[in-house]
Amino acid sequence: KAQADAERIAQEKLAEQMASEKALKDAKIIAAKKRFENQDIHFEYDSSELSSMAKTVLKEKAAWLKTNYSAGITIEGHCDERGTTEYNLALGEQRANTAKSYLINLGVSASRLNTISYGEEQPKDTGNTESAFRKNRRAHFTID
């Protein structure tokens, strides 16, 4: 009986340890996804050209996508409020497609990358200042 109790206790401890390790792994996955989704790239006024900082961020995202090979993402193109709705929708699309093309060139499969343009419709900052406009000229990434 003592041996059976010892084996049962050992199994319970092992199960607890495995559950704890799984919870830690799950927490790390959630944190990595949040980091992925919370890091936008930004653009200059009236431009879809990638800055060196944007390229660095996209390289990090490509590395994450290569280790999380089943994940698909949506790249959202956003603009500041200057310009017509139609123009900003087109510019937002160019921004999303520029980011998509760069990720493809880094080895990410195009089938995993979706794009959408929101133009000026979803500002990150509703202020009417250059600082607010700068925050709104972005590509945002969500994990599908």
Per-region residue spans from a language model:
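Generic structural signal for short, solvent-exposed loop/turn connectors between secondary structure elements
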Residues: 41, 143-144
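Periplasmic OmpA-like peptidoglycan-binding domain that tethers envelope proteins to the cell wall
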Residues: 76-142
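Periplasmic peptidoglycan-binding/tethering modules of Gram-negative envelope proteins
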Residues: 1-72
